[in-house]
């Protein structure tokens, strides 16, 4: 399966990378969680309550973050669903997370929740340059 980021190109990739660069680590965490939950829930999508439970935050905290993401144009107004731009940004972050998880497990020897947590943090906080290198490393392996 090709990485989701390779499907983007030119101006679209610039917009998505800028979107990823403009989000905080917390916002990125919500985007990745929403993408994962949308994949699991299908068309219905997650509820605000299920998102809060998934992220282990209070309902008011989740509601406030969803408001912020809506203002940024990353989450739909009427549902707890990503917009097309939000989906693209979440796909980039998710691809980074998979690459970072491979590094955590294969290179650093971390396992389980520790590896997942560190990979999500690295994916969310990576600059566009580091994000591209993470994805390239996963696709092609380390360079000499």
Task: Describe the role of every protein-language-model region.
Residues 78-97:
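Basic, amphipathic "hinge/linker" alpha-helix immediately C-terminal to the N-terminal HTH DNA-binding motif
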């Amino acid at each position: 399966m090709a990485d989701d980021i390779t499907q983007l190109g030119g101006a679209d990739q610039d917009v998505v990378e800028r979107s990823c660069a403009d989000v905080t680590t917390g916002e990125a965490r919500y985007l990745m969680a929403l993408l994962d939950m949308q994949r699991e829930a299908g068309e219905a999508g997650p509820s605000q309550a299920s998102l809060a439970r998934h992220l282990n935050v209070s309902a008011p905290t989740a509601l406030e973050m969803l408001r912020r993401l809506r203002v940024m144009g990353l989450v739909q107004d009427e549902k707890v669903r990503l917009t097309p731009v939000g989906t693209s940004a979440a796909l980039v972050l998710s691809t980074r997370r998979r690459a970072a998880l491979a590094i955590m497990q294969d290179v650093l020897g971390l396992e389980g929740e520790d590896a997942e947590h560190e990979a999500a943090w690295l994916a969310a906080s990576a600059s566009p340059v580091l994000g591209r290198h993470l994805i390239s490393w996963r696709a092609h392996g380390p360079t000499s």
